[in-house]
Amino acid sequence: MIIFCVAMLLFTFGKDARAQANPSEAANAGKNRILLVLPFDNATGQLSLDWIREAAPAILDARFMSSGFAPMSRADRIYALDHLGLPQQFQPSRAGALKLAQTLDVDSIIVGSYRTEGTGVVAEARVLNVPRLRMSDAVMARGDMNDLIAVFDSLAWRLTRIMDPGFSVAQETFLAAGANLRLDAFEQYIRGISEADQQERQRHLKKSVELSPNFGPAWMALGREDFNAQKYEEAAASFAKVSPNDPQALEAGFYRGLSLLYFGAYPQAQESFANVARELPLAEVLNNEGVALSRQGKDGTGLFVQASAADPNAPDYHFNLALSLKHHGSATNAINQLTQCLKLRPNDTEAQKMLAAWKSPTGMQTDENAEPLERIIRTFDAGAFKQAAQMMDEMEATRLAALSAHERAVRLASRAKEYFNRGLLLEAERLYQAAVTDDARLAEAHAGLASVRERTGDTASARKEANEALQIAPTLDSWLVLGRLDMAANHMDDASREIGEALKLDPASRAAQELKRQIEARTGKKQ
């Protein structure tokens, strides 16, 4: 019975997790894309290393998501187990995992363990293919304990190749994804999200961001802790530290807006909600943006109209629209909206009293200050955000599918460059590879791969891709890659020639001009 209940809950969460898949994976929808990574088994015999149990799925989930998969979140997993009275450390046997898989709405389950080997660590994992009820052979990664993140990055790459044999992103790109994260900061983060005591959680999370000030997940977790403790100014500051490139950026923006609302920073709250709404204009975001606008004495009616249209069955949106309409002189429409609110929630005593007052002979002349404030939506519906993101992804996938192979490759390469410019190398390489698959003669795709290879330290492959791009057509990025590689190898004549070619293509290129300046400084020659 317990296995069945876990399965049914995960069935629900699995559907939400689908929305995290990238639109470029539309052709692979339903093909080993929805994943559940269970905490790894601690086979070290050392309690001090128990934190790695949760570290494993944290790293794997991040790499899988960047690779186009849809891993279920830690929160979803914990929610399911908690509501069934099962411990967070729930670790099914192989037989138990197979039974669980029979009714799960996931495509793959990752189970694994880790052990020490001298001063090193060995991580091992298997993939349970749910549709086939087949467990893969074990894959393994090992390394020094100080390189723990790289060990699990390497393991993630091997597991990805099992789930998608055609996956062509280089292992070096996986390793580069976690290269800038300090292990001590990551450990503090994992301890911070795992501790039972709230003060201990905050202590670890504060230490994490102190050690690694750009570590978004730790800022997000710290913001949550401050928000739950009603420390709204501190929460707003923490949420603001989450990078726009972070997968949780929209959620951080929503809760930052709430935090700002709660301590009266209404213009900043409005801006925060507006930034989220530009990406995902969901009802709760539009409503709260309208509240922030109204609290400044401005007209939020348009936003409340959008919110009530987006979710017409939510009474609070009709309540807020009624208040706004009344404040701006539309009495009849205000009463209609308040009536609709009461149809949806008949026992809303505040709305009942307000409707009775408004219908009285002098009701519409009542002092606005005596009326209730607009209602704030205080919860972030992650499922709704995922579903909305999924709809947008599906629309984009449909648009891509309608293009010719060349047009699709151009679009994918353009999006890949956006990822690259934001430092998201794994996502960038995946889309560049997809572009090459669609059109192997697209010079920009090969040039992009050259840039990724250069960034990950694979100079031979970077040079190969850059030269391949130039055989198709001259591109600025290809000449820049070759110029940087030859300058690093002290081949200054070659570097000078290559940067000269880059400047012929784009005389205004700042990158080319800077490289020219560096070459001149090192050689003492003006080009």
Question: Which sequence ranges carry the predicted segments?
Answer:
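Register position in tetratricopeptide repeats
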Residues: 197, 228-229, 262-263, 295-296, ...
